[in-house]
């Protein structure tokens, strides 16, 4: 089922929420309608957690997640970290990462098996991504863009990549990820996915 939703008149709902097959994160301080829509649709299946990251309502660009784990930036407070650990299922590992590229959601795109990462991430960060999320990690660009998490969204069943991704790159990425991909836009033409 598809539901149209905005966060304070902003259609970029992925900035203010993040969803996996195991849990959903929703920004605190938004309208009750925004949160209640997630709760109505998902609460019977997975926990829906109101949270902030690094004292902000910006969730999507700051976190990297799958059903196995949640990676948060070093700017995440101890209180936020404890709140996430208390609210998420015990099977989900929550890990704060000491990485200078702190907008993890913009730098990493992942599903439950593979992560594509910004090519400048530290090796230690790549190892944490592999360990916490239980994925294979590949440094990659999408249509020449290093912010792979901004220009690619992948699930275990498929993905959407930047509209200027070449056919050759699309085929190579699809083979690497083992899921079908399509090049396109969101929100009436935005290349940032």
Curated annotation (Swiss-Prot):
It is found in: Cytoplasm; Nucleus, Nucleolus. Keywords: Cytoplasm, Initiation factor, Nucleus, Protein biosynthesis, Ribosome biogenesis. GO terms for biological process: cytosolic ribosome assembly. Its main location: cytoplasm. SMART domains: eIF6 (SM00654). Belongs to the eIF-6 family. NCBIfam families: eIF-6. PANTHER family: TRANSLATION INITIATION FACTOR 6 (PTHR10784). Monomer. Associates with the 60S ribosomal subunit. Binds to the 60S ribosomal subunit and prevents its association with the 40S ribosomal subunit to form the 80S initiation complex in the cytoplasm. May also be involved in ribosome biogenesis. This is Eukaryotic translation initiation factor 6. It comes from Beta vulgaris.
């Amino acid at each position: 089922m598809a539901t149209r939703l905005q966060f304070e008149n902003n259609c970029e709902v992925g900035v203010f929420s993040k969803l996996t097959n195991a849990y959903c994160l929703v920004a605190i301080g938004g309208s009750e309608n925004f949160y209640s829509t997630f709760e109505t649709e998902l609460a019977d299946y997975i926990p829906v957690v109101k949270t902030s990251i690094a004292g902000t309502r910006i969730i999507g660009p700051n976190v990297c997640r799958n059903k196995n784990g949640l990676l948060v930036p070093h700017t995440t407070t101890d209180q936020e970290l404890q709140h996430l650990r208390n609210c998420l299922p015990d099977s989900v590992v929550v890990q704060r990462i000491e990485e200078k590229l702190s907008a993890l959601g913009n730098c990493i795109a992942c599903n439950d098996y593979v992560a594509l990462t910004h090519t400048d991430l530290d090796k230690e960060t790549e190892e944490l991504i592999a360990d916490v999320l239980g994925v294979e990690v590949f440094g990659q660009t999408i249509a020449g863009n290093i912010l792979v998490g901004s220009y690619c969204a992948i699930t275990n069943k498929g993905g959407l990549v930047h509209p200027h991704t070449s056919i050759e790159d699309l085929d190579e990425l699809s083979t690497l990820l083992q899921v079908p991909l399509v090049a396109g836009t969101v929100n009436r033409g935005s290349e940032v996915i």
